[in-house]
């Protein structure tokens, strides 16, 4: 008798992707991040759907509707806390996923890597428009400041900003369209994730030693399904603890005040997961230069495969590259800290130094470390 998972047209696809998929036997817990991102995306879509049932995208009612969800809707407070903190965990998993890709040389699967960068941009866009929806002070002013950056684009900038706003300032049309974008983009992310997985399955997964693993592979199920399940349990424990014990730990207190166009907050800042990019944006005094630096701080990831000079793939056997990556990790943490500080000395100069170092690592230190390691390997 034929096994249905191997013969049914739909089951066959699932079987080849999640059950009989040959996977390297030595992939570590760093390879759990992809499945955790899938879990985060599903959780965000489900909680977001329930929130959308009660949310009102009108500037007079948006703030009150969020309060209504938390006070009057059955378990509304829990759904809202899950959704808000789920975004933070989503980005933690994304950054760890990217870090793993950089560390183990997974970026050499260029199509998968570039699709991942597009996914990162889509996710950042979704999170940004979502942050505007509660219509608190930080939502309103964050939307005003970030959308205003587009006015730096020569010739079409001002027209583009007014087109996005739907008027001459951030107002009712802006909120309505941001809600529409926030609803549709996660489905675009889900579709792009499938493309990401298709590209990955063309080449097969990388592994910690960065060599061909064809000779030593095991089926994805049961080995990695159970390994992923452990990751799921840990992630769910973290989000439950966050949502129940400290739901506002990662929120900005400014967003507990309804949006007021007449009062500018003393310090406008985005959510913590955008602070590193925000610090790079602020470190350049020129508006257009800042916008380009902000964009390039993400798009520079697409250059990583092109700037790979080493004969070895994984950082496991690359001491200089390892040091470079840990400097990058420290630099991103410094930028995150600077992004949350006011624009005054000594933060300005620290931010500028950290921003220069960020680009220097990608454009100079990474290729240089590979070149030096090749020299070391070629010694008699």
From Swiss-Prot:
Main location group: mitochondrion
Calcium in keyword set: no
Binding site residues for a ubiquinone: 201
Pfam families named among the record's database cross-references: Cytochrom_B_C, Cytochrome_B
Gene that encodes the chain: mt-cyb
Residues involved in heme b b562 binding: 83, 182
PANTHER family: CYTOCHROME B
CDD domains in the record: cytochrome_b_C, Cytochrome_b_N
A single cellular component GO annotation: mitochondrial inner membrane
Subunit description: The cytochrome bc1 complex contains 3 respiratory subunits (MT-CYB, CYC1 and UQCRFS1), 2 core proteins (UQCRC1 and UQCRC2) and probably 6 low-molecular weight proteins.
The name this protein goes by in its record: Cytochrome b
Family to which this protein belongs: Belongs to the cytochrome b family.
InterPro entries, A to Z: Cyt_b/b6_C (IPR005798), Cyt_b/b6_C_sf (IPR036150), Cyt_b/b6_N (IPR005797), Cytb/b6-like_sf (IPR027387), Cytochrome_b (IPR030689), Cytochrome_b_C_euk/bac (IPR048260), Cytochrome_b_N_euk/bac (IPR048259), Di-haem_cyt_TM (IPR016174)
Note: Heme 1 (or BL or b562) is low-potential and absorbs at about 562 nm, and heme 2 (or BH or b566) is high-potential and absorbs at about 566 nm.
The UniProt record lists the keyword Heme: yes
